[in-house]
Amino acid sequence: MQKLSIFRTLVLSLALLAGSAGASAATDGGTFTAGNKTFLLNGKPFVVKAAELHYPRIPRPYWEHRIKMCKALGMNTVCLYVFWNIHEQREDQFDFTGQNDIAEFCRLAQKNGMYVIVRPGPYVCAEWEMGGLPWWLLKKKDIRLREQDPYFMKRVEKFMAKVGEQLAPLTIQHGGPIIMVQVENEYGSYGEDKPYVAAIRDIVRKSGFTDVTLFQC
């Protein structure tokens, strides 16, 4: 009963965030939507069995090995946080190469028959310094993190645009492995600013995730 309640909550979040996402797809792509008490992958019931893998914590030569281990354990999906403070360690200096090549991580997942759920934050928790928020945000002494602070939102939008450049072409609608994208992370335990969450949703959409299903939890 509890599991059903959790699923209904997630489906409600999907309905509120996704709108008509997943209704159309490129000819070489697919769809992923929330159906009646189940997820639908290309129109067929699909149970998400997800493993959490943090690419900064795994040396790049071992990425594929860890993905294969997850598949061997019966998983079909990898959840992927995007750690803002490793991709933009200095303001306006973005790095998505080498150990930070999240697009390659997703391609390795697809190569091994795994789907991907992207969780770009901006806050990701993950027992990671500042939950992934860059230290340099604090140079602005009056900044309000995870609120509609103009400077914070401007920086989030810039970062998400870079994430979109890397990952939006890899959604299932474009033939890639990404089936869902999370909006913020565990925000309900932090605040109740619904307009802020809606603004983050809009930024995620604007960054290129126009068709993929969004969710919040």
Protein language model features and the residues they cover:
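Bacterial N-terminal signal peptides that target proteins for export
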Residues: 1-11
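Hydrophobic faces of well-ordered beta-strands that scaffold small-molecule active sites
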Residues: 49-51, 78-80, 116-120, 179-183, ...
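N-terminal carbohydrate-binding accessory modules
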Residues: 23-77, 107
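Aromatic- and acidic-residue-enriched carbohydrate-binding clefts of CAZyme catalytic domains
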Residues: 44, 81-93, 98, 102, ...
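Active-site neighborhood of glycoside hydrolase catalytic domains
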Residues: 152-217
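Aromatic-lined substrate-binding rim segments of carbohydrate-active enzymes
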Residues: 63-131, 201-212
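Bacterial N-terminal signal peptides
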Residues: 9-19
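Non-membrane alpha-helical structural segments and their capping/turn regions in soluble enzymes
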Residues: 60, 64, 96-103, 150-157, ...
